[in-house]
């Protein structure tokens, strides 16, 4: 029983609140239920520390509700909007417009997901004790992880 508990404790589901670098997490939440769980986990991880969110989404999801939930959570101090390299992506400008509707926090947009990731890392280094979260799509998680594995 002890070995089973230890194995469960050490199990990591790739792309689900996965810490890919110190204080940098990727989560493939891509619907309102997933975003709700993501927000709970992000809040638990960062506590009162500042959090930066990198976000993208595909156009056939309930993206406006997801964006509203993220903005209303009060967890994130900065938002980075990126466009994924999939035909299903929602244009970055559209995502940015929706975030602007729900929050006055700083918004920065990138055409390339990994450029946004690098900017997020830079912000995380500049903002003391901050955490970077990347979410909105499993495609996004995959793009970032692939670039990291390939050494960009």
Map each language-model feature to its residues.
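C-terminal helical cap/extension that packs against the catalytic core
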Residues: 24, 67-131
């Amino acid at each position: 029983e002890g070995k089973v508990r230890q194995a469960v404790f050490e199990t990591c589901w790739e792309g689900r609140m996965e810490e890919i670098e110190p204080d940098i997490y990727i989560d493939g939440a891509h619907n309102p239920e997933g975003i709700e769980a993501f927000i709970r986990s992000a809040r638990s991880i960062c506590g009162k520390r500042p959090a930066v969110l990198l976000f993208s989404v595909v156009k056939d999801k309930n993206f406006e509700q997801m964006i509203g939930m993220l903005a209303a959570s009060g967890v994130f101090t900065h938002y980075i909007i990126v466009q994924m390299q999939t035909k299903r992506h929602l244009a970055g400008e559209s995502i940015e417009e929706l975030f602007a509707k729900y929050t006055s926090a700083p918004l920065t947009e990138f055409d390339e997901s990994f450029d946004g990731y690098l900017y997020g890392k830079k912000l995380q280094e500049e903002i003391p004790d901050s955490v970077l979260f990347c979410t909105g799509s499993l495609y996004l998680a995959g793009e970032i992880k692939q670039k990291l594995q390939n050494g960009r």
